[in-house]
Amino acid sequence: MRKLVVGSRRSKLALTQSQQFIDKLKAVEPNLEIEIKEIVTKGDRIVDKQLSKVGGKGLFVKEIQHELFEKNIDMAIHSLKDVPSVIPEGLTLGCIPDRELPFDAYISKTHTPLSQLPEGSIIGTSSLRRGAQILSKYPNLEIKWIRGNIDTRLEKLQTEDYDAIILAAAGLRRMGWSDDIVTSYLDRDTLLPAIGQGALGIECRSDDEELLTLLSKVHNDEVAKCVTAERTFLAEMDGSCQVPIAGYATISDQKEIEFTGLIMTPDGKERFEYTMNGTDPVELGKTVSNKLKEQGAYEIIKRLNEQH
C-alpha cells in the first residue's frame, strides 16, 4: 500500500478524530504509512457569525473536497453531520466506521437538571435544531447563540451569562472529557440528534480501488444503513442550515431500521415528526420525508429558505 495523506480540519477535535481513525486503520494494516495534512475551511475562518446565517451547507468540507480532486490528499475524515447530503461526482464515502454516542450532552453551571431550570434561564447552543427542540419542550427558557470549540464553550459557560450549554456528546468523548462534567445526556425523546451525529464519513476518490479495499475493513454496515436513511431524509427535505431538522435511525432486534424524522420552526412552536420501520434505508428516508411533507413540513422549509 502506498503512503496515504489524510486531509483534516485544523481543529483539535478534527485532528483527534482523524488520528483515532488512523489508529483503527493501522490495527488492521500495521505497516501503513499515513500523514495528516491540515486544511483550513471556510467554516473554521468564520468565528463571529452564526453559521446558519452564512449558508452553512458544506462550510467545513468544500476546501477538503478540492484537495481530494487535486490529489493532494487521498482521503478526508469528516464529522458526517458536516457533510452535505449530495457528494460531488468523482468522490464517495468509502467507509462509515463505528458510531460514537449520537446524543447531545447537557452541561449546567450548577448541575441543575434541564427540567428544573428556573424560568428565563439561558442555554447556549450554536444549533437551530437544539434551540427549537428545547423551546418546544421548555418555552420558559431562553436560547443564546454560542460559538467556539469545546474548551471555549465550557469556559464561556463559567465566565459569561449562560446557565447551561448543549454540546454533541461525541465530541466530548472523542476529546477524552470525563462524563463527570455532563449533567445529563439528552435522550432522543428530549432532543433528537442531527443527521449523522456521532458518525464519521471517510471520503475518497471513487476510482481509488486500492484505498476503497482498505477502508472496507473498518466499515460498519449497520451504522451505514442508519446514516443512509438519515441522509436520504435530509436530501429529500432539502434541509438547509436555516431549518431545524433532525433525524435518527437505529437497527431493531428484528434487524429492521427504525427512523424518526423531525422538522420544526426555530421558535419551537411548529413541529412535524414521523417514525417508521423498514429494511431499505433509502426508501425509508424518502417515505418519512413524504409523510412530513403531507403534514405540511415542506411549507416551513420553503418559508425559512425564502427568509434568507
UniProtKB/Swiss-Prot annotation:
Note the InterPro entries from the entry: HemC (IPR000860), Porphobilin_deaminase_cofac_BS (IPR022419), Porphobilin_deaminase_N (IPR022417), Porphobilinogen_deaminase_C (IPR022418), Porphobilinogen_deaminase_C_sf (IPR036803)
Output the Gene Ontology cellular-component terms.
cytoplasm
Q: Which cofactor does it need?
A: dipyrromethane
Pathway, per record: Porphyrin-containing compound metabolism; protoporphyrin-IX biosynthesis; coproporphyrinogen-III from 5-aminolevulinate: step 2/4
Q: What does the cofactor field's note say?
A: Binds 1 dipyrromethane group covalently.
GO biological process terms, alphabetically, are: protoporphyrinogen IX biosynthetic process
What are the TM regions of this chain, as residue ranges?
Answer: none
Give the UniProt keywords, A-Z. Porphyrin biosynthesis, Transferase
From the UniProt annotation, give the residues forming the signal peptide: none
- EC number(s) for this protein? 2.5.1.61
In terms of PROSITE patterns, this protein maps to: PORPHOBILINOGEN_DEAM
Its assembly, as annotated, is: Monomer.
Q: Which HAMAP family would you find in this protein's record?
A: Porphobil_deam
- The protein in question is named Porphobilinogen deaminase
Q: Source species, please?
A: Staphylococcus aureus (strain MSSA476)
